[in-house]
């Protein structure tokens, strides 16, 4: 803050802008997750600062934003055909969120949509494995009877072994799930189909989610 002042850089707080400019447009936490609400408020506040819209236009923005669907964020799909292997994912949830709030929101989403017990495919960047994620990852892993740890082709990606060690030290394996390790996202998808009727959750990294969507040929323009 002090540095911004010295450099004459404008510093604007989203909470102040949104509460003032969108006082009549509030989102219910029972419908939208905390990370989504924060993104929503930041986007609308930035637009208002830039364009200084009137009340009618702000209401139009607000209405339009509520219809936005982000592929790969709490993205629940049904009957996803893996055409290469002629196999079908009855229920597939993909989410690239990798911070504390996003992982907690993912656990809440799994619970509210009755997706537990599930098979969890988890891959994360090594620089994300810090103490603030221990409890969120523990809550997430509790939903899974089978946890498949994998990695992507990126220097930032944690190895399956490093991820397993972090989860063990976080108490995430206390419920004794089955654990499988692989460096191949494609192999992880194959492993996840060992119980065809069990919901599959792929999470922890946008790289991982991108690979899953690419391998399965998922169209990012729509969800089913």
Regions from the language model: what does each represent?
Residues 1-12, 16, 37, 87-92, ...:
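C-terminal helical cap/extension that packs against the catalytic core
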Residues 24-146:
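Nucleotide phosphate-binding/pyrophosphate-handling subdomain across enzymes
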Residues 50-51, 110, 114, 167, ...:
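Active-site catalytic pocket residues across diverse enzymes, especially alpha/beta-hydrolases
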Residues 69, 100-101, 127-128, 155-158, ...:
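Short alpha-helical
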Residues 103-104, 131-132, 159-160, 211-214, ...:
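Short glycine-/acidic-enriched loop or helix-start segments at secondary-structure transitions
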Residues 122-126, 151-152, 204:
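Cofactor-binding loop segments of dinucleotide-utilizing enzymes, especially the Rossmann-like FAD-
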Residues 144, 220-224:
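S-adenosylmethionine-dependent methyltransferases
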Residues 188-217:
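A glycine-rich beta-strand to alpha-helix segment
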